[in-house]
Amino acid sequence: MLDAPAPAPAPPDALLRLPNPLVLALIAVYCGVELVLQGADLHLWGRALWRPLAYQYGGFWAGLMRGGWLANYPGQTPAMFVTHSFLHAGLSHLLGHMIALVALANLLADRIGRLEFLALWMLSALAGAFVFGLIGPASQPMVGTSGALFGLAGLLVVREAQSRRADGQSLRAVLVSVLVWLLGLTALNLGSWWLQNGVLAWQAHLGGFLAGLAWGLARGLARDQRHPGPA
């Protein structure tokens, strides 16, 4: 057996907290980008072409990653792995992502540090883009923070399972908990797919979620190695 410190459960008031400064900074950047594009859409400044140009130059294009497409500028292929997450398909898309960010960040706030949060956020966004690039449609750009959000969800699933196991719950109970999480995330994807008329980058969700799972499992193994117990 291993005598490692158990992951702490999220406090009951976690969802009601004000997000930490890092999360607030991320929200400010995402909202700032969308505000600029909204103003252009409404002809308050700039040009109405700003949004399509932003998608063309900053969205994630699977065709570029797979090869055979010409980039609009040198370095677009690696850059789009990052830039796509700062763009959204409109206010409702942005609002949904920001609400999810606050909720997930607050649930994880007492479980991981800010640097680890940022590292996982970036890794999950990259993983989501990579999986979308592998199996997503080549002719449609992917934008949004969903890959990163599902990475946080993946880590939360692992941490919840580890917490239940450390509390002495049976393997069956832990697996049921994980299954409930997976069914909930699947229902969320199906609901989003229906609301968006079939336009959903589920590939990015999958990639980010797998990255979060892998992060959580690797984190647990590293913790167990630092705190070995009697055999």
Predicted regions and their residues:
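A detector for small-residue-rich transmembrane helices and their helix-helix packing motifs
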Residues: 2-231
